[in-house]
Amino acid sequence: VLDLRFADITTADYEKLRKKAPNSEILWRIPFQGKTYDQNTDVLYVTSLTDEDVATLDYFTQLKSVEAQECTDYAQLAALAARRPAVAVDYAVTIDGRKYDQDTAVVSVSDITDEEINLLTYLPELTAVTAVGCETPEQMEKLRDFCQEKGISFALRFGTKTYPDTVQELDVTGITDAELELLQLLPELKTLHLVN
């Protein structure tokens, strides 16, 4: 057993030692984001994550969870989740001013940017998107196209009712001007009902 917990060693130093003494157990503190952590650490909290950080996390063999609710390095978080499937990677994605946990299945939006549409890819459990109101019809079209491409259900809310974008008949009684803008996103719509 090599006890190096009080030595200042890098991951490169550790690799050299491991090659020189492959049958020895090496006890050490892992350098990560400017601090050192016990090799048996099972939970880490991060606010940022680089590709190098993702690789360094491999040294934490006991790691069970990475808490990253304030981290917006989504590509690296997704890479970590793919690289270490046994590690829970907890993060949230902000879309249309709301935070959605990575295991969110349904998202509701009224306004969305191109960047936020791309962020939907970091919600691996996402099965449905609902458009509520329509501040930017062009963006909603892009969102609908994205959903179709990814196999995600796209629906629209009119008043208190939600309809899939494949609806053919719709009652528009009492809907708002913003909701009227959504009608252009219903390519199969054939009949409108309006009372009063």
Task: Describe every region a protein language model picked out.
Residues 1-10, 21-75, 82-138, 145-182, ...:
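Concave beta-strand-loop units of leucine-rich repeat
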